[in-house]
Amino acid sequence: MSNFVDVLKKKKINHVVNDNGSIVIECDLSLLGRADITSLPDNLSVGGSLYLRGTGITSLPDNLSVGGSLYLRGTGITSLPDNLSVGGSLDLQGTGITSLPDNLSVGGSLYLRGTGITSLPDNLSVGGYLDLQDTGITSLPDNLSVGGSLYLQDTGITSLPDNLSVGGYLDLQDTGITSLPDNLSVGGYL
């Protein structure tokens, strides 16, 4: 953790280290290109967005909270911790992610394009876009709600689940879907 705090001090990032060792940063934190950063401390809270592209990070700490967006594109991340909280978008494109934790809630968009993800957890909540293009996804969970558009192009999905709700555009191009459920709700183009 001292290496992480040293980086914060060097970058003149206002932060608070609480008595329990947790670190609170109220603004955005960009660690872009910092290959020397290989881990983050447990119980880290970032009020703004967290940019980790080009770091040596391969896992995220327990109880990470990001008020803005979390950018992990192109990192060595292969899994996400339980209790991850992301208020904005979560960008996992180009990572080794193959699964998501149960009850994951993403306030903004969730970008999974080109990952090895093969299924989505129950109770997944996405406030913005959900991009599953070019993934190994073959089915969607029942009661999935996506606030923005849902991109399913070039997936193995052959049917849509009951009670699917999409606030924006539903992209079914190059899927095996041949019929739509009666209770499908799409706010934009289909």
Regions found by a protein language model. Name each.
Residues 1-35:
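N-terminal capping/linker segments that flank leucine-rich repeat
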